[in-house]
């Protein structure tokens, strides 16, 4: 790791700080900015011609949660390898301060999906600020996020990509390509998001037998799904509204992988 991987990781961090293509760069507050114009640089990437379904230009919540975890991991590695370089720790501290200042939305009791435009749309991306190993949030905020995601987005086999109370909510992934693209990240539930959700749920409720039983029960709909659609596998996406029919790829690797990981 020290010889082959660690130098590459240092180059990656350095490039994010300096900036690269698609308006990806570290701002003065330590947070990562990404995207501009018609570029779609997060996983919510639907674009048809000049139409962008979910523009998330700015500082996306999950990208900055991952950025913080990358910095904390680098600090652990530099300590292990005796580099005596505290720059990662210092930058992580700045990111943590900026993240709490910019992303917490008092009105919704959870995180903005993107800043600096302050997109208060309730989406599942914020779950990674809780589920990842290194957290920037206090326990009260973590619990509030998990409660909001459970109430608004959890549908059994996945998390909705958009709050059902939002005016742009499109829950059914069916019809023409245009209709499906409108729903893909605007109400459709995604199976792979269950992994982060279950991890976050266990984290905020404590690693107790009772929590494990509750988390296991949250996966009951997945067990039922394994007997339908593609037997023994998990679909890519599900309709946001009941009965939450499986859609998209009928056997999706990251849906399966994330459920196995958290199980």
Give the location of each predicted region.
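Acidic/His metal-coordination segments adjacent to aromatic residues that form catalytic metal sites
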Residues: 36-59, 173-184, 238-246
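Short, contiguous acidic/charged loop-to-helix segments that flank catalytic cores in large enzymes
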Residues: 118, 136, 180-189, 202-210, ...
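Aromatic-rich carbohydrate-recognition surfaces in CAZymes
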Residues: 1-42, 60-64, 68, 188-206, ...
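Active-site oxyanion-binding pockets that recognize sulfate/phosphate
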Residues: 57-58, 82, 208
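Generic long, charged, amphipathic alpha-helical segments
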Residues: 160-194
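Catalytic cores of carbohydrate-active enzymes
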Residues: 14-27, 32-33, 68-173, 216-217, ...
């Amino acid at each position: 790791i020290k010889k082959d991987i660690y130098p590459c990781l240092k180059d990656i961090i350095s490039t994010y700080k300096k900036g690269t293509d698609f308006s990806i760069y570290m701002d003065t507050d330590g947070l990562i900015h990404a995207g501009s114009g018609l570029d779609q640089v997060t996983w919510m990437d639907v674009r048809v011609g000049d139409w962008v379904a979910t523009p998330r230009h700015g500082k996306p919540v999950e990208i900055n949660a991952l950025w913080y975890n990358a910095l904390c991991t680098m600090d652990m590695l530099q300590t292990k390898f005796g580099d005596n370089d505290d720059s990662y720790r210092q930058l992580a501290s700045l990111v943590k301060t900026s993240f709490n200042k910019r992303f917490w939305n008092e009105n919704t009791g959870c995180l903005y999906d993107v800043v600096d435009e302050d997109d208060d749309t309730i989406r599942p991306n914020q779950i990674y600020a809780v589920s990842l190993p290194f957290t920037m949030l206090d326990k009260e905020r973590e619990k509030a996020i998990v409660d909001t995601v459970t109430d608004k987005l959890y549908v059994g086999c996945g998390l909705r990509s958009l709050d059902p109370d939002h005016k742009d909510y499109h829950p059914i992934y069916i019809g023409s390509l245009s209709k499906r693209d409108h729903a893909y990240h605007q109400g459709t539930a995604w199976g792979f998001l269950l992994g982060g959700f279950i991890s976050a749920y266990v984290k905020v409720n404590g690693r107790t037998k009772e929590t494990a039983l509750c988390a296991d029960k949250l996966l009951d709909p997945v067990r039922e799904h394994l007997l339908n659609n593609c037997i023994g596998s998990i679909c890519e996406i599900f309709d946001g509204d009941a009965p939450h029919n499986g859609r998209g790829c009928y056997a999706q690797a990251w849906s399966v992988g994330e459920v196995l990981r958290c199980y």
